[in-house]
Amino acid sequence: KTRNKILLRVAAAALTLGTYLAYMNLNWNAEFGVISDLWNPAKTYRQYGTTVGFTAVAKYMRLTPPDGYSKDEVTAIADTSEKETKTEDLRKDNADSVTPVNIIAIMNESWFDYRSVGDPQTSESYMPFLDSLTENVIKGHTLTCTKGGGTAKTEYEFLTGNSCKRFPGMVPYVSYFTHSQYSLVTTLKDQGYQAIAMHPNKATNWKRSTAYRFLDFDDFISIDQFSDTAKRYRGMISDQANYEKIVETYENKEPGSPFFLFDVTMQNHSGYTNRYFQADINCNGYDSDEADQYFSLLKLSDEAISYLIRYFQQVDEPTMIIMFGDHWPAIEDDFLLKVIGKELPDAFETWIAGDAYQNLSVEDQEKFYGTPFFIWTNYSMKSESNVWISTNYLSSYALSLTGLELTPYNEYLLDLREKMPALNHLGFLASDGTWYRWNDSDAPEEDLEYERQYECLQYNELIDKKDRDDSFFTISGEKDEE
């Protein structure tokens, strides 16, 4: 009887494991036509029923610990980092920095410059103001973990300093946010800043209304707070109207009080075939309403950037504006063939998964993940251009220019950037300027170990609420009990 019980338990365990593995590897779309809408999970529940919808979405909610993860390992990594990081160098570099009263960060929807991957021949320049902006500005490209969609992954990387490298197909806001999260928001609020989020669309998209509460924003201005008469293109709030709302919000704050606003725009969102939108820019030698509309939207976006910068040039309070794109646009394959002249994979799914483009090196592939970014101030700051960074580093990098206090995690990220200047799910840029895939046989072992340690810290902050090393992620070292 004992033997039979053991065999029964083994069989039950094997069946459970087999069912779990089959579930986790099941393609619900291919097998059953069930599409998991992580942008709006409630839509999946409504469309397929609560049971089927939840089952389809739930597979994305499991994140396993990285290799070697433990509370002691996190403590050891944090302790080593605090001993070895170049904290004193950072403080010396920032000694003469102006501390901005206002920090405005804008993630510009589908903002991409095709000149980084090819030579688009357009009837006129689509980024003339940005090209002319050369004083008190740092410009370059920031590497993201997504293309054509997945906006919330890029904003998560910027706000938290964590990377979506381990879960490029998942969205932390939707899958993993169950408790308070440390971020740029908490770092600035601990230093007296008011923190406002803005997005001219539904607050529930990507579960932002919940995510922003866990990130500790004081207020969230969504589409409901925009006027019905606000300028729209293709039914979406224009960047001009969006930035006017930023100015209005700034003007309503207490003069001199520290102010942080994080904005996610909507104007340039796909698709680009609206028959009521008048395109002003044409692609020479390429007849495409989609490409013409996209580049025309970029030009309108550039004009709105000009408005915002020129406004804050006249403001007395020291102000920093950070802008970056969330991902390249979802635009037709034929145009890409025209721009780069090389074959692309057949399915959009392979792009998102990061599968290798045919005939493209890893360095060329990464260019499709590199969106524009700039950091501008209305006070004197050393200008730089052609900077390569990744979005997980960007907020720490911006903070390092302000003279504000940094968390140990900020300092860790700045130190990691010295070793690995840019990284995403596909690969990384080494300190010697060489690009590697994570599974390349010649990828430096030291860099792979740095990345493993980074994953341990991220897992601790994002998932391990019970054993989270709160002091490493805050300037105050106080534990958040939420």
What are these regions (language model features)?
Residues 1-101, 121-141, 173-182, 299, ...:
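N-terminal secretory/membrane-targeting segments
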Residues 88-101, 105-108, 113-482:
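Solvent-exposed soluble domains appended to multi-pass membrane proteins
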